[in-house]
Amino acid sequence: YGVIRLFIGSDTPGGMVILLAIVGGIFGGMIWALLVGLLKNFGGVNEIFGGLGFNFIADAIMLSLVYGPWKPEGVANGSTKMLESIYWLPQVKGTYLSLWALGIAIVGVVVVTIILKGTYFGLKLKAVGKNNKSSFLLGIPTNRYMLLSFVLCGLFAGLTGALQVTGFNHVLRNNISGGYGYLGLMVGMLANIQPLITAPIAFVFIGLSKGAAGLGMDLKLDSNLSGVIQG
C-alpha cells in the first residue's frame, strides 16, 4: 500500500505501480523474515515466538500509519482510503476473485515443489530441517540454509500481503491478515513439507473459517464449531 501511495497522482501506468507494489511487498517480507531467522540462528529464539514477536511490531507500525499519516480525513474506522481501481488486480466480474492472484499462487506452489523435490538445494534444505546437527557434520552450511529458508518464506508472505491489498481488500486496515499466519502454521504442519497438498488443505481451512459466520444464520449452529473442527 505504501508503494502505491508514492505513485498516486503520477503518470506511471497502473500495471507498473501494481508490479512495484508486489515487488515491494516481497522485499519487505524477505527482510522481516530474515530478522526472525537471525534471532533463530544467532540468538536461539524459537522461530514461532520470534515470528509472533515481530508480528506485534509489524502490527504496531501498521496501526501507527493507518491511524496516523495515512488516515483519511473525517474517518475513524481503522482503514486507509480505498485505492483507485487502476491500482487493482483484475477481478472476475461479480466476485472478489482475481485470476491473476490465483495464477500467481498456483505458480508459487509449483515453484516450491520443484525446489524441494527436484533440486540439490531443496534436498539440502530438507536435510537441515530434519536434522540440523547431522547436516552440519556432513558439511552443509546449516546457518546459511536456515536463513535462506526464512528468506524464501518471507518472500511468499510478502507476496501474499501485496496480493491481498491489490487483488482483494484494496485498502490497508486494522487486522487485514485475519489470522492467516496462525492458520498457515496448522496448514504447514498438516502438509508436512508436501507443497502440492498445501493448497487443498489451506482451501479446506479457509472454507471452514469463512463459513463460520453462516453457521449461526443458516444452520442455527454455534459459529465456534469451525474452530473446533480446525483444532
Mark where each language-model region is.
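Transmembrane helix-loop junction
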Residues: R5-L6, G37-N41, A127, A191, ...
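Transmembrane helix-bundle core of multi-pass membrane transporters
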Residues: E47, G51-G118, S223-L225
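Helix-loop-helix "hairpin" substructures at the membrane interface of multi-pass membrane proteins
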Residues: T95-V171, P195-L196, P200
